[in-house]
Amino acid sequence: MSTPGVPARPGKIIAVHVAYESRAAQRGKRPAQPSYFLKAGSSVAATGETIERPAGTSLLAFEGEIAVVIGATARRVTEAEAWSHVAGVTASNDFGLYDMKAADKGSNVRSKSRDGFTPLGPELIPAAEAGPDSLRIRTWVNGEVAQDDGTSARQLISACRGSSPISVSI
């Protein structure tokens, strides 16, 4: 992992279920309250590394994500204070094996936490240069835009309110 400013092995990766309107529209629903799941630090990879689909699986899917990298301990902080604990933001891809998703019953351990399934980077944008309410993500597949959406970093940060430095929320 060699993205400047992004931890090689974050202590925690907290992922938000259905963080973007485009994903909610694809699924036809949005949860009333945000829910989260954890990914292993070993799932982190650098941009451009090869992702391997395990034998016996066929539904390897992407989810473009905005990764918020926590730079200072964030315990019992208000939503208004949360951005001051952010080191920066970068792009991420939350790969998943959808053939295993139903069997995992929401834990996502086998389907989304495999080695290399969370590429980060290529660069960390310092928090001072990125506003928490104006983050956008665009994902291309074979040169075609497959995702173009935005979200509030406040939603992503709320997952990290008990986090220490080198945590990542996607």
Task: Label each PLM-derived region with a short phrase.
Residues 1-63:
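Extended, compositionally biased flexible segments
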Residues 1-6, 23, 29, 98-170:
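Catalytic-pocket segment enriched in acidic/His residues
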Residues 24, 47, 77-79, 99-101:
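Short helix/loop capping segments that flank catalytic or ligand/cofactor-binding pockets
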Residues 42, 71-75, 95, 127-129, ...:
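Short loop segments at secondary-structure junctions
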Residues 58, 65-75:
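Phosphate-binding/catalytic loop of phosphoryl-transfer enzymes
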Residues 65-69, 90, 138:
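Residues embedded in well-ordered beta-strands
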Residues 75-90:
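N-terminal accessory regions of nucleic-acid-interacting proteins
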